[in-house]
């Protein structure tokens, strides 16, 4: 399975990307939340990926954050939710907004997304309840320990720490802390653990 792609961003046409990795071009679909945060074409990009193998195609879906990929995987487990709909959900709301909607059981918020009707929204709420985890919920809204929690977590994961270790370390980073200071504080917390 392809879990990560690092290379040069050659093309970006929503929601499709073409990333050159040592002479091989990978076509990757991304949610709009990832698309809007991509570098310019010709620059280096690192994406966490989910590979889906079907009878007629091998598809790659890319994400900038571990939370987006984890949420995408949870959405795929729900009956009737395919990769396109999971991308539509992540394109229409952030992981934090989705976690908040699930926590508050807010079906109306989900029905505003394209392709999500009342029954699908209720199924999403029912099946995601408790599955997004306290970790994703901790990054939602006012409960966020740092304004840059996602960036700090990405850096820790890139340094080889697990997502769980990173989330635990981020709890030691006060709100309003910058990314580089936040990484230092999180690393300090990890060294004590």
UniProtKB/Swiss-Prot annotation:
Gene that specifies this protein: ruvA
Superkingdom per UniProt: Bacteria
Alphabetical UniProt keywords: Cytoplasm, DNA damage, DNA recombination, DNA repair, DNA-binding
GO CC, alphabetical: cytoplasm; Holliday junction helicase complex; Holliday junction resolvase complex
Designated name of the protein: Holliday junction branch migration complex subunit RuvA
Purpose: The RuvA-RuvB-RuvC complex processes Holliday junction (HJ) DNA during genetic recombination and DNA repair, while the RuvA-RuvB complex plays an important role in the rescue of blocked DNA replication forks via replication fork reversal (RFR). RuvA specifically binds to HJ cruciform DNA, conferring on it an open structure. The RuvB hexamer acts as an ATP-dependent pump, pulling dsDNA into and through the RuvAB complex. HJ branch migration allows RuvC to scan DNA until it finds its consensus sequence, where it cleaves and resolves the cruciform DNA.
Region (Domain II): 65-139
Region (Domain I): 1-64
Coiled-coil stretches: none
GO molecular function: ATP binding; four-way junction DNA binding; four-way junction helicase activity
